[in-house]
């Protein structure tokens, strides 16, 4: 026998031995309940965001996730670099000294993720009876306003005239959101069937890039068929655009406006149809109410922030990159000033002004709000605080604001003027550098950039 054959044989035996030592075993409902508060056990929901957040799984009478469960979606496996896998899992609380209990209603996904972790040396059990668990009188948790973030499957059902959970309307419009008129809207070249284009200029204007006047916004909305009583679903290639417009529509008075989590990529991955033809909305005569209906969610200019700080102790939360926050760069070629409003707290962000990477999962869906809340706690940002999120011009700030709305937090706002408005007048106090020379806080979200194929015992 050649040395190569011996090496291959020994390697195969080693892999078999590893898989034998890390067999995946099933856990019963009784055993799960017995260990639900056991610190040596970790329960992990591997389903898509909408199901974890609160939507009902197929054939389930209740929605949400098992009490105390964290989230690690099976689809993430395709986006986590091999050299980051264990550190990323550790950041989620998954370690080899714990018994990891995975559950999912999709047994193929459950097998994939459980064998992947077992092959890497984790102690793994699987819970295959989640639907019966959900239909029994066992504890489930969900987010207060989980319906704000919808899945491709939910939207597809609504488009086809069905009544998916929480949807009671018969008037639906879907918009791809990006800057520019149709001829400049590259993200609209391929879009969800029936979707329209929403130009972000319809709700904001230079030089501050704050919300336009109520009259201008009303004219743009009715010209594009948007009324207060229609269900509006928004998506964008860059999540910031859709969530910026969602905040603006909620400010205006649209009662049911939602975000397609995962955008067009998630839609295509779900094998749902797209088209290239241009759809033009039919104008309407009236928005249906006076704009704005919810002015309180907007702190427009620096003076509004200062007033709120004096009245209720408002905390100003920066969602600008660390280099912007510490005054190394302004972040924009049209914003000359560097620094932050005095007293601003860093609320995590992204690599530059175009993204909010700390808030995204490996598959580019929104990160679990519970993880973000834990990061905020380290920064002194808490549920009962009055919080105004801001960035340069309001786009990035819409993401954390949206998450607080999902969680049912009451006193959260977007400071629309952001750093751009603040730095325009030298009378407003500015801080530069990291407060107290603090180091950049860890977002615990480094999954690398290399796609992986998997390394499990599953054949």
Which residues make up each language-model segment?
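Gram-negative bacterial Sec-dependent N-terminal signal peptides
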Residues: 1-20
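Cytosolic catalytic domains that perform sulfur/thiol-centered chemistry
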Residues: 19-459
